[in-house]
Structure formats: structure tokens, C-alpha cells
A protein has these predicted regions:
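The feature captures two recurrent sequence modes
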Residues: 1-131, 210, 222-263
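A contiguous, surface-oriented mixed alpha/beta subdomain in the mid-to-C-terminal portion of proteins
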Residues: 110-114, 120-232
Length: 263
């Protein structure tokens, strides 16, 4: 996560309504239409089903209350508006309660192609559709419960699991490999890199391998992990994650597949 934000949260009024400007609605519309076109034949069916169930459209930035109600009807999950950056402990606590934390601001036009921190487009368009899928929603909630139980000493490696699944995961389907991670489906550069470029590495998902794989948040990903089903994700929570993390620490990290970030 970035250490500080140049954005401030959009706050709701007394009725819980978030007021977005015409320019902010236009940015949402441009992002939505571009990604929906680009994702055809690239994102998994469960993702598109979720977009439909949430009633997302290019018309305007969606209201969190509408997203929350539709998610609750689908899987009992919900959302909670938060500042751009929150502590890992708060993040995992919300997941454990079945609430996905959402940044409420939308990127400015100068950041329309790439923003390092999560905005409402990444959060709602990227994360929320799959939370209408019961197996996936169960995985996310149980993952939060495990993270809360394990505590801050395990956060670094827990975020690696989150990064290579929830953010940048791929899934094999009868129709071929498809993307589901929010960092892919909400980004044109990541979508093209993962699904068109042929310049990245695809690995079968293996928990120990993931736990030993470093990542950078500010580059197109060089490595993606591929699952066979969303049930495979939920099975992660049946493992002794704490013991696996301790084992990964003892074994050490794999060499990074990227250059060190310039200081």
C-alpha cells in the first residue's frame, strides 16, 4: 500500500448519499465502458454475473448504499466506506465481519490510466462483483477471520495471499484462462498484460509458493497464480495458515521477479 494519499475520502450527507460531480461521473463512465469492452472474453463468468447482480452501469458513480444492499441480498456481504488508506488490522477486521472496505473517492483525470492507491472504481468495479458469489465471499470473510486471529506479525505474508488471489488472481475455466482479481479487471494495463501480452509467467496456485513470492504494487505484475475453482480458494482457510507462514519464513523468499524500486 502507498504510505500516504493525495486524495481525501468523499463523505456522505446526513442521508448516506455520496455527492459526486459531473466530472467524477464522467470519469466513472469512461472507465466502466473501457473495461467492460476490454474484459469481454477475458474475465470469468462469475465476474460478469456479479456486475449484473449489482446493477453497475456507466451512468454514474454507484452509491455505496445500493452496492451494500445488493451484496447483502446475494451473499450477506456488505461494504463500508473508509479513507483511502486504513491500517491492516482494521482492514482484516472488516473482512472478518463480512464488510469490504471501500475508498469513496474517484481518481482524477490525470490518473485515469493508473492510480497506485485504490479508488472507488477499483473497489466497486474490481472487488464487489465477485462478492456476489457465495464461494468467493466465504473465502474472503474466512480469510479475514484467520488474519484477525493470527495478528500483525503475520500480516506481511497474509497480504501476499490476498495479492495473488483477490487482487491479481486468474482462474482456469472450460472456456480457457480468465481473470478475476480486482487489480486486473479494473486496470487496462494489467488486463492486457495478463490476458494478451504473453510476457508474464503463469503458475498453478500453491500456498507455500505464494507465501514465498515477493511483489511490487507499482508495476505490471510479472507473475500470476492460477486457480482451478473458487472452492480452491476457500480451502486455503482450512489449512493451518500460521504454520504455513512460519514455514515460509524459515525457507525464505524466492528471488524477486522484478527490479528493486528506486529510492
Amino acid at each position: 500500500m502507498p504510505k500516504e494519499s493525495t486524495y481525501t475520502a468523499t463523505l456522505p450527507d446526513a442521508d448516506g448519499i455520496y455527492a459526486y460531480t459531473a466530472e467524477e461521473d464522467a470519469i466513472w463512465s469512461e472507465l466502466f465502458q473501457r473495461q467492460m469492452t476490454l474484459l469481454e472474453g477475458k474475465a470469468c463468468d462469475e465476474y460478469f454475473d456479479g456486475v449484473a447482480r449489482l446493477g453497475l452501469s456507466a451512468d454514474r458513480v454507484p452509491q455505496l448504499g445500493d452496492v451494500d444492499r445488493r451484496l447483502a441480498a446475494a451473499t450477506g456481504f456488505g461494504v463500508e466506506g473508509v479513507p483511502a488508506l486504513i491500517a491492516p488490522s482494521r482492514f482484516f477486521q472488516l473482512l472478518s465481519e463480512g464488510k469490504f472496505p471501500l475508498a469513496t473517492f474517484i481518481r482524477r483525470r490525470e490518473h485515469i490510466d493508473y492510480i497506485e492507491e485504490p479508488d472507488i472504481f477499483h473497489e466497486v468495479f474490481g472487488h464487489c462483483p465477485l462478492l456476489t458469489n457465495p464461494s468467493y465471499a466465504r473465502f474472503v470473510r474466512r480469510f479475514g477471520e484467520n488474519a484477525v486471529a493470527l495478528g500483525k506479525d503475520y500480516s506481511w505474508h497474509l497480504f501476499r495471499i490476498f495479492w495473488f488471489t483477490v487482487e491479481f488472481g486468474l482462474i482456469d475455466t472450460p472456456a480457457g484462462r480468465r481473470c478475476y482479481g480486482a487489480g486486473i479487471v479494473s486496470s487496462p494495463n494489467e488486463t492486457r498484460a495478463a490476458m494478451e501480452s504473453g510476457q508474464c509467467e503463469f503458475r498453478p496456485f500453491d500456498l507455500m509458493t505464494v507465501l514465498r513470492t515477493p511483489y511490487r504494487i507499482d508495476i505490471v505484475q510479472p507473475i500470476y497464480y492460477v486457480i482451478d475453482s473458487f472452492a480452491e480458494l476457500d480451502a486455503i482457510n482450512d489449512e493451518d495458515i500460521g504454520a504455513r507462514i512460519r514455514e515460509a519464513k524459515a525457507l525464505g523468499d524466492f528471488p524477486p521477479a522484478f527490479a528493486a524500486k528506486a529510492s
